[in-house]
Amino acid sequence: MLSPKRTKFRKQQRGRMRGVATRGNKIAFGQFALQAQECGWITSRQIEASRRAMTRYVKRGGQIWIRIFPDKPVTMRPAETRMGSGKGNPEFWVAVVKPGRILFEMGGEEITEEIAKEAMRLAQYKLPIKTKFLALAEGEKPTQVGKAPPKSSFLPSDETETAAAQAGTEASSASSVTPLES
């Protein structure tokens, strides 16, 4: 199951889930995705159960990407414990999900839309929130999160490059040493 290797603090406050997801709301790796329709906490066990259901259905074909990670610890007190004496110990980890967040992605040569839809439907049953199946349009490419645009867009064209070089030499010659008047 998924959990962080180490954290700065052992315990966190519960927090509030307001608004919609502004990050992680576009298909970045595969052709098909499962998108959250409402907010909620998804535990590492639920993520693992969904992943198993999808991989079991698609067998060896294609690839599955998990786009959420359980990084929030949830603490619990032992049963029949009196009030006070501090916060409980971390029991499990959850991923905080807002509406619009992509949860899982799927892609590959052998994966058709029907196979992906059925695999995502099986994964939906394991999750505590409403979700929606998404597919990229024919010929559309994923957005590739974390990749820089091609280098050519950073380089200036030949005309601007030579003009900038000339302007730089003119400016440096004009601002060269001027005699001081005493």
Swiss-Prot record:
How would you summarize the oligomeric state and partners of this protein? Part of the 50S ribosomal subunit.
Q: Which NCBIfam families match?
A: rplP_bact
Q: Which organism is it from?
A: Prochlorococcus marinus (strain SARG / CCMP1375 / SS120)
- Segments of skewed composition (Low complexity): 162-176
Q: Which UniProt keywords apply?
A: Ribonucleoprotein, Ribosomal protein, RNA-binding, rRNA-binding, tRNA-binding
Biological process terms in GO annotation: translation
Disulfide pairs? none
Q: What is this protein called?
A: Large ribosomal subunit protein uL16
Name the job this protein performs.
Answer: Binds 23S rRNA and is also seen to make contacts with the A and possibly P site tRNAs.
Under the heading InterPro entries, the entry gives:
Ribosomal_uL16 (IPR047873), Ribosomal_uL16_bact-type (IPR000114), Ribosomal_uL16_CS (IPR020798), Ribosomal_uL16_dom (IPR016180), Ribosomal_uL16_sf (IPR036920)
What does the similarity note say? Belongs to the universal ribosomal protein uL16 family.
- Any one annotated GO CC term: ribosome
The gene that this protein is the product of is rplP
Q: Where is this region: Disordered?
A: 140-182
Q: Looking at the record's lineage, which domain of life comes first?
A: Bacteria
Which GO terms of the molecular function aspect are on file? rRNA binding; structural constituent of ribosome; tRNA binding
Presence of keyword rRNA-binding:
yes
